[in-house]
Amino acid sequence: MTRAYLLLDSHLIPNIFARLFELANITVAHSLYLTTRYAEMASFGPVLVSVEPGSALANTFIEQWQGRAGIWLESDADEALVLEHLRSLIHVRLAGDVTAFFRFYDPCITRLWLADLADVERNLLMGPVRVIRLPGGVVIQQNNPHQPCARYATTPWLTLSAQTLEHLCQARREHFTQRLVEHGQRYFAACLQGLDVP
């Protein structure tokens, strides 16, 4: 049976645990940083919770959080396997044997990271996750139901090439620029009038 989950950025959702309890009576939310070398940062990291489609939590996610504070996942696998696999993705290896946090649960990064990959590579990265739903109706699917689950290790198994990293960073810069323009138009509209006229 397919179950739906939300992978939420607790740093971007104020009082996330109180909100989860208020919206869905959720008392157990799985921090991806728990049981890792980053456990002391668990209150700021990603959190996995199960969700019922059409519920108050699902609607709040779609209306308020989906744009930047998390992703919707679906899986047939046991919740413990989904959690284990997602936990294995929290950090990556970069060139020069550098370890870095990986915000794969940011919908902008998820789209850029997975959407253009070959099926075989995407299937491996998604592990037991069958579907990821992103804003704008974007759906990323895993095509091999027998994909193994990765396990967290102190040394990351996932490596991002310099080219992939640059691709993801460029997207973040574009996203920041767009948000800056929107902020200026919203709060300083009168000051900006006439600036685009030669």
Describe the role of every protein-language-model region:
Residues 1-49, 53-56, 77-80, 94-101, ...:
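A contiguous, surface-oriented mixed alpha/beta subdomain in the mid-to-C-terminal portion of proteins
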Residues 59-60:
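Short N-terminal amphipathic alpha-helices
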Residues 64-66:
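A surface-exposed, charged beta-strand/loop segment in the N-terminal or early-internal portion
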Residues 82-87:
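Short, motif-level signal for alpha-helix interfacial/capping segments enriched in acidic residues
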